[in-house]
Amino acid sequence: SLTRLCHALIPSMKRNGGDIINLSSLGALLPIPDFAVYAATKAYVSSLSEALRLELREHGIRVLAVCPGPVSTGFGKAARRPGFTGNMMPGRNAFDTSVETVVKDSLRALSRGRARVFPGMKIRLAALLLSIAPLGLIRFFMGRRPRKVLPAPNDSPSSAS
């Protein structure tokens, strides 16, 4: 796990130096129906990174949480089940960020000693808006986003398509 890996490497990093870059997500800032575990896990990654950053700064170890939105990698398409057509939020691709932008912005943020980075202009703007929007408004919109279609309770997983 991320926690074990970080704690296993920290003693050596204190002696020899190094940096930690953890991959979080813009989703860490949101309550996401049908993706609650994902959002909560990414919030954990961000919080762990922030705490480690404070703990390790006296040792010269920089810690960065990278919080991208959707990244243009092709992974999403490859990971879908055959015939899967649902659960694509309208306009989602408008927020895609290139891998190159994520890497460039992340390395720049690390060199500047930042705690978090939201790579790409659109994701930075989204993060800014989320930071000033009332939580009730965020809940309202997230509660109305397209949802997964789940099989009926009496359907077996093998009969659901």
What label would you give each PLM region?
Residues 8-17:
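A short helix-coil junction within the Rossmann-fold of NAD(P)-dependent oxidoreductases
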Residues 6, 41:
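Active-site helix of classical SDR
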Residues 38, 46:
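Catalytic tyrosine of NAD(P)H-dependent dehydrogenase/reductases that use a Tyr as the general acid/base
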Residues 32-36:
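Active-site loop immediately N-terminal to the catalytic Tyr-X3-Lys motif
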Residues 58-121, 154:
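SDR active-site lid
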Residues 12, 30, 51-62, 72:
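Active-site-adjacent segment of SDR/Rossmann-fold oxidoreductases
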Residues 25:
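Residue(s) in the substrate-gating loop at a strand-loop-helix junction
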Residues 113-145:
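A transmembrane-helix-recognition feature enriched in membrane-embedded lipid enzymes
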